[in-house]
A protein has these predicted regions:
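Short conserved AdoMet
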Residues: 73, 122, 155-156
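A short acidic, Gly/Pro-enriched loop at the edge of an enzyme's catalytic core
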Residues: 119-129
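Class I S-adenosylmethionine
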Residues: 1-108, 114-118, 137-139, 170
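Conserved beta-strand signature within the Rossmann-like core of class I S-adenosyl-L-methionine
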Residues: 158-165
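Local beta-strand N-terminus motif with an aromatic residue
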Residues: 55, 124-126, 158
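Conserved NAD(P)H cofactor-binding loop of Rossmann-fold oxidoreductase domains
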Residues: 132-133
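Receiver (REC) domain switch-region micro-motif
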Residues: 58, 128, 161
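A short glycine-rich, Lys/Arg-flanked "PGG" loop and its adjoining helix->strand segment in the class I
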Residues: 143-158
Length: 170
C-alpha cells in the first residue's frame, strides 16, 4: 500500500499489490474515506441526478493523493485546487499514486489558496467538494462567510456544495 500522511492523518491510500504479490492492474480503488460505494458515491449520484446524469464541471478543494479523481465519469471535467506544490507532485507521480494518472490524467490542477483561485475562476460548477485539511483540522479561512459566499457564487443553478468536516474536533 502507498499512504499519504499529513501530520497524524492519512489523506489517501492505494493498494499497489494483489494478495499474491503481483502488481495491481486497472483503475486504482480509493481505500480511505472516499471508497467506492461510500458517502461520496451517494453525493456524486445525487449531484448527477440533479443535472440529468452528467456533471459538466466539478471543483475539488484539496487534492490529497487524488483519490476523488476515480469518482469522475467519462466526459466530466474535475478541477482540483491545491495550495501545496509537494502534494501536487506526489499525486501526479504514478510511482506514488495512480489515481490522477489512471482516472483523470487531463484534470486541471490550480495551485494556490482556493479562496482566491476559485473566486478568480470564470467557471460554474455542478459540484464543489471542499476537502482541504491541515493534518486533521479544516483550515478555518476556508469556512468563513466570505469564503462560503464565494463557493456558492460558483455553483451552477442545480449545483451542490459538499463540505468534508470529519476531524478529531467535531
Amino acid at each position: 500500500h502507498h499512504l499519504l500522511f499529513h501530520g497524524n492523518t492519512i489523506h489517501g491510500a492505494e493498494r499497489r499489490r494483489e494478495t499474491d504479490g503481483t502488481p495491481t492492474r486497472g483503475r486504482p480503488e480509493p481505500l480511505t474515506y472516499y471508497y467506492f460505494g461510500g458517502p461520496i458515491s451517494e453525493v456524486t449520484a445525487a449531484a448527477r441526478a440533479a443535472v440529468a446524469g452528467k456533471l459538466d464541471n466539478v471543483a475539488v478543494v484539496g487534492l490529497g493523493a487524488g483519490s476523488l479523481a476515480c469518482h469522475r465519469q467519462e466526459g466530466e471535467t474535475w478541477t482540483f485546487f491545491e495550495i501545496d506544490p509537494e502534494v501536487v507532485r506526489l499525486a501526479r507521480d504514478p510511482a506514488m499514486f495512480r489515481f490522477l494518472s489512471s482516472c483523470a490524467p487531463a484534470a486541471p490542477i490550480v495551485l494556490g489558496d482556493a479562496r482566491l483561485t476559485l473566486a478568480a475562476s470564470p467557471q460554474q460548477f455542478d459540484l464543489i467538494v471542499l476537502d482541504a485539511f491541515s493534518s486533521d483540522a479544516i483550515p478555518t479561512h476556508l469556512l468563513t462567510r466570505e469564503a462560503l459566499r464565494g463557493y456558492l457564487a460558483h455553483l451552477s443553478s442545480h449545483g451542490m456544495l459538499l463540505v468534508h468536516i470529519s476531524n478529531r474536533h467535531l
